[in-house]
């Protein structure tokens, strides 16, 4: 037997594929060989699979050189260094995906090969993305991106433990002056005049220094108190009391009361309440509901409480009741739509377009590899990874968990799979080093390069990789499906079967349930063009998942429930 034939046989012996008949309600996949014929696998086969075992956690700097830990979990690496990116390496995947009637087949391989049945296993388009040339590997953020800023004041997305996922209108950029004490991440910073409080995420100094008490620059805050606008106020609110919406039942502890016009005595006081905490419900403004507090305060809501409260320019800013700096402005809530998120992902590498927001070929390849590894679409039911962060209360501000929460970085097995130590439905999952991916939950993630259109077709970044994904997609950069976007929302099953969508998971029906078929929820498009989100938020329950797809947002959407995961394709 020739050397080439021996090598080919070795490759084929390693190939494991999956198939599923989508007319059946079962969530389980079956296993097959390189030509789609059924096989039975021994327990633990995954540890010997070159693709799954080749997924390893590493850290990468701006030069793009990976440093690996002592095992696939990444032991020995510093996951909290904001100057590096904590990534998961995915080795090149060759393969094929096809349908026989209603049965879908996915057969991945570590090398290119022609099967005995004549099927060519070719390089997956994820490894042509962001440039158009073939790659031997790609890298995906271990975590949803957090906010970081470098010494030059450039904001960038960072995959690091301890970071709060960066989501829209949730982070506040605040100028400061007269800085005398350098803060620490997670310190609470409070305005002495406004009463507004936020948690420190990052900062940079543009002039002066801490030692000379004249540091000036920008500080970035999360979990900033909220603003509830009101009018027709007849009785003053009292700080420390709980404000309650008469019809919504929304609550929040009153931190400060700001009257901008009118007077309580004449029943026309207008302004806003600074509120903190509460039950997270939004106040009703159409029609305006009555807000009251326990001391008799009364007014009507003209704001729902989702807007961040402003600081007072030039006020003292304190940490633990000690003044550490002064506010340079009122603060700005940072928008974060898909294009902006992609820009912050690319900002880490400067102008290097090999960095960016995860694209659909990468995202859906990982989804198919998860199905291969775990054997089911009902991943939230697996004890090994749990349900993820999917059952926390709906909130007006970010209500998920931070990257690395509940000790998950150490709680997983040596292959990077497991769950945090917190309560079921409120603790993160991890699969092969990727937090919050296979169960969905915590936040939705933008997927740049797939564009839904209401009552229209899907536009998809061209699989040849020559065009860089953008939002909206640039003319000439994409292919389009023949099949129209599914305009019915629901738990979905089969995906579109056509050449343009060969490698992607675009819903073709809404015939599943939370425990049948795909087990994850699809929301139909509402805009032309729209933007695609994957995963699901911290309160979405069984609707979240690795195949959770939300096509109902506009390209301009910026929400505290939407973030993103970065990729680097060297």
Describe the function of each predicted region.
Residues 74-84, 115-169, 310-437:
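Short aromatic-cysteine micro-motif
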Residues 44-122:
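Extended, Lys/Arg-enriched charged tracts that mediate electrostatic binding to polyanionic substrates
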Residues 170-290, 295-309:
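Autoprocessing Asn-cyclization modules and mimics
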Residues 451-464:
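A short, polar/charged loop-to-alpha-helix boundary motif
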Residues 1-12, 565-570:
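Enriched but not universal
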Residues 10-48, 55:
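Primarily auto-inhibitory N-terminal propeptides
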